[in-house]
Amino acid sequence: MIGQTIVHLRLAFLVTTVALCNVCVAQSSATAQSAASPKQLLVIGEEKGYRHEAVSHAMATIERLGRETGLWSTTLRTDSEALTKKKLEYNAKNLNDFDAVLFFTGGDLEMDAQQKADFISSIHDDGKGFIGVHSAAITFVDWPAYGDMIGGYYDEHPWLTFDAPIIVEDPSFPGMQQFPHSFVLRDEIYQMRNYSRDKVRVLMRLNVSKLDMKNKNVHRTDGDFAVTWAKMYGKGRVYYTSLGHVDANWDKPELQQMITEAIKWTMRLSNADVTSRPLPRNEPFYPGCSTAR
């Protein structure tokens, strides 16, 4: 009887050991696969005209976030050469090698007509992701296809760098959960033209009840000052945020999490609803409401 019990215990131990080994092997394989095949992100920090001091810090932060999470590998460029599907010399990467492109740019980048066509096609037709940060909305302001893709263009920053009163309009979107419903962040927020919330999913907007609407540079009369949005462009996913002008903000965990989730979403590592929604007018933050504050 004792001998049979020992045999049964040994068998049970062996079965458990084998099961645990299988789990470990599976986990190791999954980890190795993840480490061996991160997504590829191209970050462009080229500016023509005004130079933003935060660009270098932002690029370094985005590279670090990808490396630390293991989710993406980052290629940093301060030129536009890689924005093409054409084979480049010296084994340089082109758009075909990336899952998403991030712009912290400004002005008319040095791209010929074929590069522009390749860039738009890579998002609209190939389904690659695009993330636009801050001055990406002052890029190619005379190129309608780019404006249609990103969702809007810069039209002054009436309040310059100020304590911006921000409302999180869609707390369910990845990267919004860490923010309170309303908060203040010192940054430079753009007023937008060629923008319509009918074409985007607004994630953050300014609280107009706390703005100086008598500022002579205020052009919008609808009270819709979007700060961050997401949208589809053909097959591609597009994300834009006006945040990022202030260098120190790139050290804030909340902003880093927002950018991480934005990149993940554009790379299809997460999903979210980007159906457009009307400007809320039934909450205490809307100036037309009797409880506005």
Language-model segments: which ranges?
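Bacterial N-terminal signal peptides
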Residues: 10-24
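Extracellular ligand-binding/catalytic regions of CAZymes and related secreted enzymes
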Residues: 34-38, 45, 53-56, 60-69, ...
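Catalytic beta-strand/loop cores that center a nucleophilic Ser/Cys/Thr
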Residues: 73-75, 152, 157-234
